[in-house]
Design a protein with these regions (language model features):
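Sequence context surrounding c-type heme c attachment/ligation sites in exported
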Residues: 26-37, 64, 85
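Electrostatic cytochrome c docking/interface patches
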Residues: 15-31, 43-46
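Flexible coil segments in periplasmic/lumen-exposed cytochrome c-class electron-transfer proteins
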Residues: 86, 97-151
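N-terminal secretory signal peptides that target proteins for export/translocation
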Residues: 1-4
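The canonical Cys-X-X-Cys-His
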Residues: 32-42, 91, 95
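Gly/Gly-Pro-rich "capping" loops immediately C-terminal to redox-active cysteine motifs
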Residues: 29, 45-81
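Bacterial N-terminal signal peptides
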Residues: 6-16
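Internal catalytic or translocation cores that form aromatic/hydrophobic pockets or channels
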Residues: 80-90, 94-95
Length: 151
């Protein structure tokens, strides 16, 4: 009888196990399209009407600072993306590869899954106020980033 119960449990769990194993891994580009392009657009330009900042001439500088890297892990699109930390690192690196160029030409350091996990665990109670800190830090370095119209 115990063997029959064990087999029943295994058979009941089999469809869920197969479904989880069958889920395809999406490319960072595909995850960008599915999770980010709705607001930032296919060209990473954001929208003035939607108060979404553009990536070009900004995201590489933001990712070049400690504050900026933490900020990037707390923007609403990342927080609500349902991506795991590895996928978030991959999408962020895709964004940096496509739009992260700075005047120096030096690429931003790629995100790792461990870094994403660590930075997402850091408390950022007000992401708008935190972005202001990032922008102020960059301004002190002589870098202006995309406008951010939030109050």
């Amino acid at each position: 009888m115990p063997l029959l119960r064990s087999l029943s449990v295994l058979i009941a769990l089999l469809p869920a196990t197969l479904a989880a194993a069958d889920q395809p891994t999406r490319s960072p580009h595909t995850n960008y399209i599915l999770r980010c392009a709705g607001c930032h657009g296919f060209e990473g330009l954001g929208t003035t009407e939607g108060d979404i900042p553009a990536f070009p001439d900004s995201v590489g500088y933001i990712a070049g600072t400690d504050l900026g890297r933490t900020y990037m892990m707390h923007v609403p699109g990342v927080v609500g993306s349902s991506l795991n930390d590895r996928e978030i690192a991959e999408v962020m690196n895709y964004v940096l590869d496509v739009w992260g160029e700075t005047e120096s030409g030096a690429p931003a350091v790629p995100f790792t899954e461990d870094e994403v996990t660590r930075r997402r665990a850091e408390p950022v109670p007000d992401v708008v106020a935190y972005r202001r800190l990032v922008v102020d830090e960059l301004a002190e370095m002589g870098v202006k980033v995309a406008d951010y119209p939030w109050p």
